[in-house]
Amino acid sequence: MKKKVPKFIEQSLARVANLYSFEPEHHLEKIDESLTPNMRALRLAMTIAEQLLSMGVVARDVVRMAQGITRTYCRRPVHVDVSYTLVTISQDRGVSHEPLTMARVIVPDDPNYQLIQALQLLALDIRRKQLSLEEAEERLQQILKKPTEHSRLVVYAAGGLVSAGSVILYGGSLLMASIAFLLGFLATGLLRWLGRIGAPLFYSQSLVAIFVTLVAAGAAWCSNYLGLSVNATLLVISGIVLLVAGLMFVGAFQDAIDEYYMTANARLLKVVMATGGVIAGVMVGLYIATKFGVTFPATPDRLTLADGHTQYLGAGIIAAAFVLRNHSRFFGMIISALIAIFGWWISRLAMSFGFDIVTASGIAAAVIGLVAVMTSRLWKFPSLAIIAAGIVPLVPGLSLYNGLMGVVLYPPNSANFLPALAILARAILIGVAVAIGASFGNIVGRPIRRQFINLFRRNTQIS
């Protein structure tokens, strides 16, 4: 009788046989890696849009740049859509070809004003049909291969100068400005380190705000034993200005006005969370300091802590240091300082005519936005940088501090608690007025600049 081989042995032998089966190889045709000029143009527009959006450029400007590039190199029209973390380019190529859609995820990054200007000039040259597709691709590759950046020490020192300029703006002494510089240097380094390790923005802002407040309290405590005059209030205000200065609240309002609502909502929420982190950190720091017996001097909620010339010097230092912190060139620092001084003068002038500080700040921001849009191409410096630097001195650091100090010191049933909330609300209103004013100036300046450009081109053709 023939014994039956177990089934598992048959399966194992079958697997062994399959291992040594020699079947003819099938030569698969590989996909051609070369791209059509149309796809290369779409990729070029997508890369420029991705870089600009990651650095906070307004969505409408990015969409117009991308469409200008595709109109130059593509036969079929292209639709560009932005939703803060995603940019999409779609092209309908007719009934005989499949539609094309490209999408990229936007990873937020710190602004680099030299990189922004280089990309904007590239897009402008493409729209003017001054570059072939090959030349544009090569130029983009060179721009992104090695973007111009300042060293970390320069960036940290720029953060220190922002804090020192804030102290000078409010009439601080040279000693106070030196302490604020060191504090801003360390705070900028801590903020960058938290960003590198992936800490969420809210907690990064909170931790740095706590650090600034406690260092200010420690400086005030040490000054009592050393016989030095150190105003901890000004140190905290300089830290608040440093932390709030980098927020893109003007761009968020601009996106909302331009009807890019998803992008605007995301950016506005980011600004709210970052500002909330600063508020929470300062409140925690003030609470800890008061528990250890360190008292902060009361500061009048008026900008009369320094004479006019000193205020202008402080405003110029803040603006120049702010753009230096974002990798600006030297000429951009001079422009930003002059615009900030001019904007500060406008706000003082408006207040002299009887306007309150909220309205005066909005008027100054509107003038800054108008001047930035009108002169950005002439100076070859991004209007985003001019606006951001010009409005930094208008940041309501003093009002925000006084409101937070009142909330910490007085219980809810105290008669001084509601006035503290009112001061805090006014600080928020100043920030909103500055954002709306800068956006309004930007909107008004766009058609005026377009008319000037068209007039210049007509005169050039006639001559």
Language-model-detected regions and their locations in the chain:
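Soluble N-terminal domains of membrane-associated systems
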Residues: 1-136, 142-144
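Hydrophobic, membrane-facing alpha-helical anchors
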Residues: 125-139, 154-165, 181-191, 286-294, ...
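Core alpha-helical transmembrane segments of integral membrane proteins
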Residues: 148-251, 325-326, 330
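Alpha-helical membrane-inserting segments
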Residues: 165-166, 170, 186-195, 215-223, ...
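C-terminal transmembrane helix-loop-helix hairpin of multi-pass membrane proteins
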Residues: 235-240, 251-253, 259-275, 304-310, ...
